[in-house]
Amino acid sequence: MVRENIDAIKQRPTQYARLRYRLKNANVYVSKGGYHFTDYLDPVNEISPEIDTSQLTEQEASYIETQLQANSQRFLHQVQVLSHYLPLRNANVLDIGCGGGLLLSLLQREGAQVTGIELSDSRASYAASRHNLEIHKRPIESDFWQKGYAGYFDAVTLWDVIEHVNYPLQTLQAAANVLKTGGLLLIDTPCRDSFYHRVGEMTYRLSGGRFPTFLNAMYSSHLFGHKQIFSTGEMKELFGSCGLEVVQLQRFHELSFPYEFYLKKLLRSEILVKLFQPFVRAFFRLFKIRNKMLVVGRKSEHVVASDTS
């Protein structure tokens, strides 16, 4: 079982945790057990389930194509990981936070029956229109999924998603509930026991909070921003609390966006961003820092019921 209930802690951060990092875009609290999270929650209950197609502007489409889906090898690798554990032909797969739908499109080509959840109007519209996919703008915790699709899917995936949700334990329980017995839950997410987070902690401490470096790129109090970063141990405990047997947990190197995206979060000057880009590119070619983790869990017969109240 989880040593602490992170969802309960997040509802009362000042009572159950202490403020440790005051960042440019977020206040990061740390619980007694070590959970790191911001005090911001997305207004999910105010989001309409209808997809507003007018939000898919040319600028938004360009962002999806040149930034969000720029690393095509990343999506191909995700297909490879899933196919290692599950024959894709006719498999029912749900991707939570499916973005522009590229992964679902690739899975569909392999014969999978795919469905996506995306709460961003522009991304949901892009995935539905450009890839002709079934996309729903309803959170996994809603009755639509919990009552209509309980025990339905062979696999549920959350790629770079669990760090964005309001209540991660509730999200994982809800995802486990829509899995068949023996079904798979696959997650990748930034890892707190990594070089970047540790360096950020050190520079913040040594500078008295003036130079958080990587921490500024890892947490955000903006809509759908990073609300929590987990350690590998915490993620393993969360899976276990949801009745999921961890069959794979590994750290690996991956950048979800182009180098420029991260440099802009670290450096305020466009000139410095352009100056540092070639050095950063060379650095990552030499050193594959394991900044993320992949966790694969299999649903056992005894699963904790999802509490979506």
Question: For each predicted feature, which ranges?
Answer:
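Surface-exposed loop/turn positions
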Residues: A91, G182-G183
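Conserved N-terminal segment of class I S-adenosyl-L-methionine
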Residues: M1-W159, L169-L172, R251-E254, E260-K264, ...
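S-adenosyl-L-methionine-dependent methyltransferase catalytic module, highlighting the catalytic core
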Residues: N166-N177, L184-V303
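A short linear boundary/processing microfeature
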Residues: R130-L133, T181, R205
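A short His-aromatic
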Residues: D160, H164
